[in-house]
Amino acid sequence: IRYCLLSRGLGDVYKRQYKDYLSFNDFFTRKIEPQNRRIDMNKTSLISPCDARLSMYFIDEKSSFLIKNTRYTLKELLRDGELAKKYEGGYIGIFRLCVDDYHRFHFIDDGIKSHERHINGVFHTVNPIANDVYPIYKENTREYCVHRTENFGDVIVMEVGALLVGRIVNNMEKCRTKKGAEKGYFEYGGSTVVLIFKKNAIIPDEDILVNTVAGYETKVNMGEKIGTSVYIRSVSYTHLTLPTNSR
């Protein structure tokens, strides 16, 4: 804990000092000093929901995406072909969190979120060496909701767990949301957040797309602008449901 905070210059970023954490999980779920994460409140600014390394991809019917060493089509990721079809022509943002990152995630806009859909997978290590040694069922436990936002349309927000994640904790079920408010957190382990946007909803920032095409991730902080809304809202956001949980 001391190494993670002091060697990376994070000692003044969080609310507690390293000696105040009771366990590594306590440290892992730590909160941040609000003044250390500026949230871009411009209505057209798409913000990062978390501190992470970001890759952003265009979605078409042949697309597949590597998430924690597992390749998914959008249909496989959501386990819902009808829902996946609605997002063709849009973008998917994959936010990879490292162990020393702030492991709480936040809402990207005002709106309404649906109930969470939970999909059981088989936990597995994200270590490629272990994957070479053991035949592992490559599917992750994950949860997602549809966030009906004011400025970006219906956005799928997914949290993905791996071997060392005890739980994905979402603070509330269906509720109204405020931009920048905490949505939930990951307990101990490496974790990933995924945002999925419909066609004509956003334009990602150019540097993020250039880095992704070149095979590089872009380091982003929660609240930082990562794109711009081009969404035109034609109906008010009201009722929203999701299929029952897949177990």
What would you call each of these model-derived segments?
Residues 1-14, 237-247:
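Single conserved hydrophobic/aromatic residue that forms the stacking wall/gate
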Residues 48-54, 109-112, 180, 201-202, ...:
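Generic structural motif
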Residues 49, 108, 171, 177, ...:
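Short, well-ordered loop/turn sites that connect or cap secondary structure elements
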Residues 146, 201-236:
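Acidic, glycine-rich catalytic/binding loops that coordinate metals and/or anionic ligands
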Residues 178-194, 218-233:
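Short hydrophobic beta/alpha edge segments that flank linear recognition/processing sites
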